[in-house]
Amino acid sequence: MAEVGKAEVRVDAFDKATGRTKYYEDLMPRDALYVRIKHATIAHGFVKSVDTSAAVKVLTCFDVPEHPFPTAGHPWSMDPGHQDVADRHLLNRHVRYYGDDVAVVIAENEVAAMQGVRALQVEYEELPFVLDVQKAMEPGAP
């Protein structure tokens, strides 16, 4: 406990106090676009449609080519026996969990991107789901 009660020397304090420290926003190019993702509001189902009329142009799961990609914890392999994420895409028509990504709004600023996401109206075909691991392993479980 030799550190308790001692003053901490902050090597970056002067630069922060004088405004010289570079933060994330300082490093953004002036013409950078902002992205916000629309997340599913159901636990399981399919996206039937996305009404983008309230936003100028929004990418949805129907606009993005179906190119599978590896996700964290799921390395991609050329071996067909090890391609367990062949149905995973950037945006998903098949919703597998609450919060799954279904659309992307790209805008000139963060506020417009957030407003665009809020304006999207997604219609779903809801499917049954289970919340219990044991029930999920039963034959015929969704």
Q: Where do the protein language model's features map onto the residues?
A:
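Flexible, low-hydrophobicity surface segments
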Residues: 1-142
